Amino acid sequence: MARTFAQFRGVTKAIVGIGRWAAAQSTVYDAATERERRALHRQGVSAEVSGVFVTPDGDTPPTALNDRMIGVSAAQLRAIDEVVAVPYETVKAPAVRAALRSRLVGSLVTHTSLARALLETDTRTGPGTADVG
């Protein structure tokens, strides 16, 4: 496993998913216990990017669940030259916005309705501004 993790330093491109911190919107959420879900909600988590937890403002707080997960860290993900997210479902717009604010993701490949949802309303700055940070 150590050899695998050592390979992270050489990764130059990554394709990631974005999960909304809700049932059936994140595989991590669905695998977490109810206690873990509540704890992350209390920390303000609204999204996850490949297991990295994200708040609406784009912060990536350390969590107790991080200590038990095997995967890339926020710092490792940010060190990758090109990170492309492939989110699906309009309901994930706030999670996608949080992921973009976190600087974990640099590019999106998505469908028209989610793209429109991202462009039409930004919860921090109002309609039509699409400010992601």
Q: What would you call each of these model-derived segments?
A:
Residues 1-133:
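Conserved phosphate- and dinucleotide-binding cores of soluble alpha/beta proteins
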